[in-house]
Amino acid sequence: MAFNLRNRSFLTLADFNTREMEYMLDLAEDLKKAKYAGYEGKNLKGKNIALIFEKSSTRTRCSFEVGAKDEGAHVTYLGPSGSHIGHKESVKDTARVLGGMFDGIEYRGFSQRNVEILAKYSGVPVWNGLTDEDHPTQVLADFLTAHEVLKKPYKDIKFAFVGDGQDNVSNALMLGAAVMGMEYHVVTPKELEPTKETLDKANEIAAKTGAKIVVTNDIKEGVKGMDVIYADVWVSMGESDDMWEKRINLLKPYQVTMDVMKATENPNVLFEHCLPAFHNLDTEVGKEIEKKFGLKEMEVTDEVFESEHSVVFREAENRMHTIKAVMVATLGEQN
């Protein structure tokens, strides 16, 4: 294509236009096919990549590590206790230190401001692996999965996020949908509607791309005609019991059940989730929730999670292919 993403950081999908985002998604498809066929290139050969994780991770860490290795890069993992970032050394100083040693930096942590500072001062591409406000790499996998299964152009796929409308994944989905010209519904309690800042940003982009952003408290109205129903956890780990109880009371009516899936009036509707999901009692956290609050399932029922509508594990695999595409597009030799 006639544009170049080399040396660009990947902080939020709002930083990209439709063609750039389509390019990364198309590249992910190509890289996935190459991996399946066993003839991957080494587009990141000789590159050194730092992975900063202030929060624990399964899918994001594995996706960056496997994706980088597939393309010939070397990875250094800095876990929650493995660096001084923000504690004994400022983010700005850390950026300048790591920028002198590495060709690219991934950051997964709390503050969006931190990933922006890393990008500003490191002098190398920085990739947002998750912050409290945004989760852009997740959304590329979400969109690619829906596109693969539904065989529809991206702009024709309709997404509805059901749950906490201020959730970082919902924010990222909204911005991504706006960039791609898609229809996106946030189905959420009034108390948890998206912030004005995020909604204004999405609508500003949507005005240029033809996207449609809808916020509603009505579940039936919000999911009708949708192609994808999306859910995420209701509460982050480490929150107080009072916060758990408050969130559960607010969001219990927004649990994704088979009735919600049927309310789409679309027999081919998909269910997506960024994972991990609390859909049964097979985890210690699930058992604790059941003991304290009497819930055997939270944001999604086990019936939906294990149904033919669910594409969550294909979606999880696609984290690796899309993250690989982001690294190759911004750091590799392919462009």
Swiss-Prot record:
GO molecular function: amino acid binding; ornithine carbamoyltransferase activity
Keyword Cytoplasm tagged: yes
InterPro entries: Asp/Orn_carbamoyltranf_P-bd, Asp/Orn_carbamoylTrfase, Asp/Orn_carbamoylTrfase_sf, Asp_carbamoyltransf_Asp/Orn-bd, Orn/put_carbamltrans, OTCase_ArgI
Known catalytic reactions: carbamoyl phosphate + L-ornithine = L-citrulline + phosphate + H(+)
Annotated L-ornithine binding sites: 168, 232, 236-237
Positions that bind carbamoyl phosphate: 57-60, 108, 135-138, 274-275, 319
Annotated pathway: Amino-acid degradation; L-arginine degradation via ADI pathway; carbamoyl phosphate from L-arginine: step 2/2
Documented EC number(s): 2.1.3.3
Stored SUPFAM superfamilies: Aspartate/ornithine carbamoyltransferase (SSF53671)
Protein name per UniProt: Ornithine carbamoyltransferase
UniProt source species: Limosilactobacillus reuteri (strain DSM 20016)
